[in-house]
Structures are given as C-alpha cells and as structure tokens.
A protein has these predicted regions:
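Alpha-helical structural modules in large enzymes and assemblies
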Residues: 1-485
Length: 485
C-alpha cells in the first residue's frame, strides 16, 4: 500500500509544475528520532501537502540530512530538467539544517538552484531557542532540567495535588513536538519559584509513597536553588516574550517585506536590550574580605556571561538567516486585490523586478503586460488572494492568455508562507507529529503513517486496492503462490 501510494504521488508531481519540500526532525513517544519529508504542490488548482516518508537518522549532521532529503527528491524528480521544479525548502530542528554556510539548505540548493529557503508557518518560531539548545551544552542542560518540572507533575495525580496546594495552577505540559509550550514553562517556573520551592519541600517531608518521587523532588529543588539555573531562567524569561510577540506578528494575513523588516529590526533590538542586562544576571562576586593577599579571580561568572552573549548571537543570526529570503512575500503583494486600483495608476515595477530575479523561469516582459491587464479590469478586483485569482483564471479558460500570471500564482501558492494558511491546506507536518504519539518499526511506521495521514488521497486514488493486490501477488519471495495460469 505504501509503495502504491508513493507511486501515485510521483505521478502527481510529474504532472505539476512546481514543488516545495518541508522537512523536520521529530520524535515518537519512545524518543526515537525520525526525519519526516513532506512534499507540497498543486493538484487541479488546489495545494496539497503529501506525506512522503520517515527516515531514520544515524547521524544528525548537515551532510547526512541533506543526503536523506536528496534521496527522497531524486525519486520524485528523477530527471535533470525536473530539478527546476523545486522552488522552496523549509526546515526545522537542528541548527545544521538552516545555516547560511554549509547548512542543509545550502547543500540542497547546489542541486536545486531555484529552491529558496523560507520560513514555514508549520514551524514554531520557538525553534530559535532550540538552536541555542542544540549548540550550547550548558543551555541544552538548562532546558533538559527545565522540562523535568513538567514531566515530574504529569506522572501522578498525587504530585499534582501537592502542586495545586502550593502553586494553585498546573505547569504547562512539555511536549517535544510543541516547542511553544517551553515559553509558557519558562514563564511559569520563573513566576512561581518560591511556590515551587515550597511544593518540593512539602513533598520531601510529607510524601508517603515511592522514593523516586522524593529523589526527583530533591533534584528539582536543587535546580531552583542553583545560581546557574536561575541565571539562565532569568535570561530566557526576558527573551521568550519577544519570541512570542514576533510569532504573533508573523500570523498577520498580509505579510509584506516592509512589515517583516520592521519586525526583524524590533526583535533584534529587543534581544540586544536583553543582552545588555547580562552583566546584571551574573554580577561579579566581590571578595568576602579585603586582605594583603591577592584576591582570587572567579571566572565562572565571566564564562556564563560569555555563554549568554553567544546565545544572543545565535538567536539573532538564526533569525536573520531564516528570513534572509523574503521576495516571495513581495511577490504575493502583486496579487493583493485591494491594491489593484493603485497598481493600475502606478505599476509596481520594483516588485516585479525582484520577482523576476528570484524566479528566472518567468518571462518578465510578458508578466508585466498580463499584470497590467489584470490591474485594469474590475472583475479581477473581487478576487481575495492568489488562490481565488488562480481559480477564476482557470474557470474562465484564461490559462493561455495569462500564462505567466498563472505560473507566478502557482509558485506563490506552492511556496509555504510564514503565516497561517487556513484557506490552502491544514499542515501535514502537524498531522504527522500527532500521528507520532505512537511508536513502531520503520517500515510499518511509514506504511501506517501513509494510510492514516493520506487516507483521503488513497480513497480517491483509482483502483488502489486492485493495484495493491496485484503488487502483493507478484512479489517473488513468498511461501504461497497467488498467480495461476
């Protein structure tokens, strides 16, 4: 069934003009790391996101991940001329996936030159902090300890009763496929430090049960009394709200490059403001007494301050690289129907120029002429968005007349945008992560994931069951014979 479904996807991609790949590293309930590959393209004017497969990762470096993605792409784009179809790539997870120099996106672009790296709405922006976690060992340890708070209280209703008595609210559950919960966890632990200390002390003294609970409560209590942990908690408590604000701003319906640039500037300024407070997070330790002896110099706080400066740099650097390419946002404004009348008076030549530079498969002069006609006619001003305009042109049998406009519309709709796309499709990546609440062997996982996530696609596939039976019957290494003359 899995192979038949993949062959149908291959045929759909063969018939489509453009393709985007979305990849992410995710875990099942057994914490087994999987790399998932999702393919996004248009079918009969409707955008679809098809689950392709899970791939086990023995190594998490950029070259290994790029090889896995390239192996998947080579199956759906086998010919050299097909490589121009890939116009977007979206990655989440480990830092090696998104570096400007030698990251996965750079390696993939060597083989697929038109595959621009863009931020996808399905990827939580809190992965900026995940980048810090994956690169700096001390911060990775901090988040590991932090997640222990929510894990501790999700194991037992009896523990939750102690928490409710002391804190009056439950901690956000730490779910690895939902990084936005980490921000809530940081804020909750920071705001209720004293209450949590009281709770753990209460458990240590009054717990009547397993010793594991007492041991874990003692460990978490030590975290809340540890100067390093509290310093990092203070830092991320200041950073997290700005990440949440930025994520909310990116959900704006009409997201243009000017607005994005303002958001970038404000976010970078906010991070730099937090960066300036780092010396106050770990203030220098003054000698306990003055003496004729030379005082000892404690460099540990200097090292921790250096780490937080490094984390600040990582956050800013990753954010800038993630939104380095934003021409697709500018191109989308060409089809903002509210601006058609204005464009009819003053044509957006600069936006058209950047669009043609980003997508060389477009004929700039022909596209300009077609857009000028659209801007001048009233019937097109009723279209709300690129999808509606594409459907109108197709239903009106104008695909040949507006061939370059159709091509650009397909590119923009195929490209995952930064904001939510409810009118296009529900994120397949989110459905994959929901499915991964289960765990099983790789082959069975791929097959059952395909049947679960793409059940509608399989139901609509012609003669699917018959083709599965025929493939099964023609398998050579079987104990029983199913074909008779």
């Amino acid at each position: 069934m899995f192979k038949i479904a993949q062959s149908d996807i291959q045929q759909e991609i063969k018939d489509t003009k453009f393709l985007a790949v979305i990849s992410d590293d995710t875990t099942d309930v057994s914490n087994h790391l999987q790399n998932v590959v999702i393919l996004r393209y248009l079918v009969s004017g409707q955008v679809v996101e098809r689950f392709w497969s899970f791939c086990s990762m023995k190594q998490g470096d950029a070259v290994s991940i790029a090889n896995v993605i390239d192996a998947c792409l080579s199956r759906v784009l086998p010919n050299a001329e097909d490589k121009s179809k890939l116009i977007a790539q979206c990655y989440d997870g480990a830092s090696v996936m998104s570096g400007l120099e030698g990251g996965v996106q750079s390696i993939v672009k060597q083989s697929y030159p038109h595959a621009h790296y863009v931020h996808c709405y399905a990827h939580q922006l809190n992965l900026v902090l995940q980048q810090a976690v994956s690169q700096v060992s001390q911060i990775r340890l901090f988040f590991a300890n932090l997640s222990g708070f929510s894990v501790f209280f999700t194991r037992s209703p009896k523990r939750v009763a102690f928490l409710d008595k002391s804190v009056g609210r439950r901690l956000p559950r730490s779910v690895k496929t939902r990084w936005n919960f980490q921000s809530r966890l940081v804020l909750t632990v920071y705001e209720h430090q004293d209450d949590l200390i009281e709770c753990f002390q209460d458990i240590i003294v009054n717990w009547n049960g397993d010793q594991t609970t007492v041991r874990e409560a003692s460990g978490l209590l030590k975290c809340l009394q540890d100067r390093d942990f509290l310093g990092y908690l203070d830092f991320f408590h200041k950073i997290m709200p700005h990440v949440e604000i930025l994520y909310a701003q990116l959900q704006r319906r009409q997201l243009d490059p000017v607005f994005l640039q303002n958001c970038k500037s404000n976010f970078i300024q906010a991070v730099n403001n937090v960066r300036s407070t780092i010396p106050h997070i770990f203030p220098p330790i003054t000698p306990a007494s003055t003496s004729a002896k030379r005082p000892r110099v404690d460099t540990s706080d200097e090292e921790k301050s250096r780490i937080l400066h490094e984390v600040s740099d990582i956050i800013i650097s990753h954010f800038c690289s993630r939104f380095e390419f934003s021409n697709h946002l500018a191109s989308a404004t060409l089809f903002n129907s509210e601006s058609f009348e204005k464009y009819n008076q003053a044509f957006p030549s600069q936006i058209l120029k950047s669009t043609a530079e980003s997508y060389p498969m477009l004929d700039e002069s022909k596209l300009r002429s077609e857009l000028a006609v659209i801007y001048s006619r009233c019937e097109f001003r009723q279209c709300c968005g690129a999808v509606a305009l594409l459907h109108l042109l197709q239903e009106s049998n104008l695909t040949e007349t507006f061939s370059e406009v159709i091509k650009l519309l397909m590119i923009l709709i195929t490209t995952p945008m930064s904001s939510s796309e409810a009118e296009r499709c529900f994120s397949t990546l989110k459905r994959v992560k929901t499915f991964l609440r289960n765990t099983m062997s790789d082959d069975r996982l791929n097959a059952l994931a395909m049947l679960s996530i793409e059940k509608k696609f399989i139901r609509e596939s012609s003669n699917f069951n018959q083709r599965v039976i025929e493939m099964f019957a023609h398998l050579k290494e079987r104990r029983a014979t199913f074909l008779y003359k």
